[in-house]
Amino acid sequence: MNAPLPIIDGVSPSSHRLPAGHWETILEFLKERFPDVDTAIWLSRMAKGELVDEMGLRLNSGSAYRVGACIFYYRELESEASIPFDERVLYQDEHILVADKPHFLPVIPAGRFLHETLLVRLKKKWKLEQLVPVHRLDRETAGVVLFSVNAATRGHYTALFRNRKVRKVYEALAPALSKISFPVTRRSCIVRGEPFFRMKEIDGAPNSETRIDAGEKAEASMGGARLYRLNPLTGRKHQLRLHMSGLGIPIMNGGLYPELSLALAVDSEDPFSSPLKLLAKSISFEDPLNGREYYFQSSRTL
């Protein structure tokens, strides 16, 4: 479905399908569904014509609730902190765009991040209304991200990841470990943990796999850490962090594994002082449309 509202400053309208329920008006639903959004904000959006249905019809405080209807609106943030690091575009053609993401920058809007996201920055700068990430990196991870530029060919590139046709290489800094002979392959069953933003490994059929090799020792200032090369064969959330932690070599500045660490809480005076030492160094694949072998590498280092 095409959105009936335009993209503004790189921000696409959000949408919400109306479920079955007891509400008489759309405003009643919005007030209950989004209790943290003040009613005055919804009324303001309505007055500006920035809350519409799937046909582009403006909604108001008395608009009747329709099960199955789709409403569109723009997310707004009262304030949004600037992220003082720039992305780089490594490649672009009529089908794909490849970006080199800095640490701390989310890929897509969520929570307290809207304009300061890789997607919105790129859409605004390059005027690419159909731009969509084909895969994701965590906000804390830097490195290579592949985007689809053309909706008509997007499925070819999402299929590459779904069918594990993309070769991914990560680099990580973690403690040196002499009792393991590298390279080693870690397989485990990863499920959602507690709190909700953590994952955990449990006994069960493996649903994740990573090949890990050890490289040279890092500079002395890194406290004897070692550089590791990680090749994930699957893409579970926090997979690399969990697998490294499970081997007894948690990635530096992780803060989530093996335990939730308050000691690594972000410094309020400098929230960017301790980036996670994890970098999506490269991706490579055979282009599904022209058969060319592509290799894209981040210029960033840990």
Predicted feature locations:
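RNA pseudouridine synthases
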Residues: 1-302
